[in-house]
Amino acid sequence: MEENKKILMIIGMEKQLEQTICRAANIQPENALVLKSVFPDISQPYGDLMRDIITLVHRNRAEEIWIVRDKYEQMADEDISDLLNRDKDLNDRMQTLEYLFQNCSPEFTQSSIDEWLSPSENVAEGVQKSVAAIRRHPLIPLHVKVKGFLIENSILTDIETFFVLNTGILYTTADR
């Protein structure tokens, strides 16, 4: 790993994940910028998480962005929209938001509030979606490399390699 290369890592909420990644990739902790996120996918290309990513990349001159998630990360057992729908007051608000999702494109990139509230079906898919969203963002400098990884037993696997091995299909966007 290049001596002073800054890497922005967007990781899950698991304890010790940052240290495990730094050891596995031979990254000095002082060269790692870390953002923690509950879900593996970026649901809004112009939301708070993306704004934080853009700010950290520019402020710290990060040369790479890594989205790294534990391969066996526990996805939510219960759908958040189911929890919100149990409350009558929140249910009314959900219907209003659903109307906005249906009628206020392109502000909302998802087609429904349920799609916005729910993460991807699996961790690998969420990481791949995030990599694609960051690569396409016009405020991410073109020289910044964007990569996705799954970590299992302290071993990092590039997400594009993971998809080829598991599906035989390479889901990728422009090399960046």
Locate predicted features.
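Divalent-metal-activated hydrolytic enzyme cores
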Residues: 1-5, 14, 40-45, 60, ...
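Short, conserved "active-site rim" segments that organize catalytic pockets and cofactor/ligand binding
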Residues: 1-50
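Short beta-strand segments
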Residues: 10-12, 36, 67-70, 147-152
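Generic hydrophobic, helix-prone segments enriched in Leu/Val/Ile
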Residues: 21, 71, 97-101
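Short secondary-structure capping micro-motifs at structural edges
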Residues: 50-57
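Ordered, amphipathic secondary-structure segments that act as subunit-interaction surfaces
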Residues: 58-78
